[in-house]
A protein has these predicted regions:
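Solvent-exposed loop/turn segments at secondary-structure junctions
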Residues: 78, 95-96, 134-135, 164-167
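Early exported N-terminus immediately downstream of N-terminal targeting peptides
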Residues: 24-101, 105
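Sec-dependent signal peptide recognition
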Residues: 2-10
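A generic structural signal for beta-strand entry/edge sites
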Residues: 13, 123-127, 152-154
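Low-complexity, intrinsically disordered terminal/linker segments enriched in charged
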Residues: 159-199
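N-terminal signal peptide c-region/cleavage motif recognized by signal peptidases
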Residues: 15-19
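Short beta-strand edge/turn micro-motifs at domain boundaries
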Residues: 140-142, 146-169
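Surface-exposed, charged secondary-structure patches
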Residues: 99-141, 196-199
Length: 199
């Protein structure tokens, strides 16, 4: 189940066309177009895995608010860091995030995606509710997207919840565990991130 969730997180967060502005700015339509394009892209056997990875890195940088996600996952420790340490963390987190996504690259086919509805929480956030329809090979999977709309013309994905599991919260808890076990030494977290990136 964990492997399935990781794969769905990968699909949900990173795949769309190379032109981020080709999608509608209305949150429900944006997510619907993005994911349906994603499934088609990843199931295309004419695209090599290497080319998919390159495309995915560009896509993620355009459509996911990686900087905001990184600051959230770092937690309150970010308030104690100097500018050099923050700059280093942001750079490492971006590389960590991209590798984490591309390492889940696989093939997708015969997955039916549906938008269930949405809930505008504020002027800057909308939760889009969706699901992967049940099939003979997998159960129904519910996915809720947190879409940041401060710039109405360019929505960004800040989090998603797959069957109750928040990607952002899970990552924050993982980093907090590392820091709490090492007296909040940010250099230990840097080492862990570098180890993953270079592995």
């Amino acid at each position: 189940m964990r492997k399935l969730i990781n794969s769905l997180v990968f699909v949900a967060l990173v795949v769309t066309s190379t032109n981020a502005y080709s999608y509608d700015s209305e949150p429900e339509i944006f997510i619907d177009e993005l994911v349906k394009d994603a499934i088609g892209t990843l199931s295309d056997k004419n695209i090599s895995k290497a080319d998919k990875k390159k495309k995915i890195e560009i896509i993620a940088l355009e459509n996911v608010d990686i900087d905001a996600l990184g600051m959230y996952t770092l937690g309150s420790v970010r308030k104690t860091l100097d500018q050099d340490s923050l700059k280093k963390y942001k750079s490492l987190f971006e590389k960590y995030f991209l590798k984490s996504l591309t390492s889940r690259l696989t093939d997708y086919s015969d997955q039916k995606f549906e938008i269930i509805g949405s809930d505008q929480k504020s002027e800057t956030y909308t939760i889009v509710n969706s699901k992967i329809v049940e099939s003979s090979s997998q159960p129904e999977i519910k996915i809720n997207w947190r879409v940041y709309t401060k710039n109405p013309a360019k929505p960004l994905i800040r989090d998603l919840v797959v069957e109750g599991l928040s990607l952002a919260k899970t990552q924050k808890e993982e980093f907090a565990s590392i820091l709490n076990s090492n007296n909040n030494d940010i250099n230990i977290l840097f080492l862990k991130l570098e180890e993953f990136i270079n592995n």
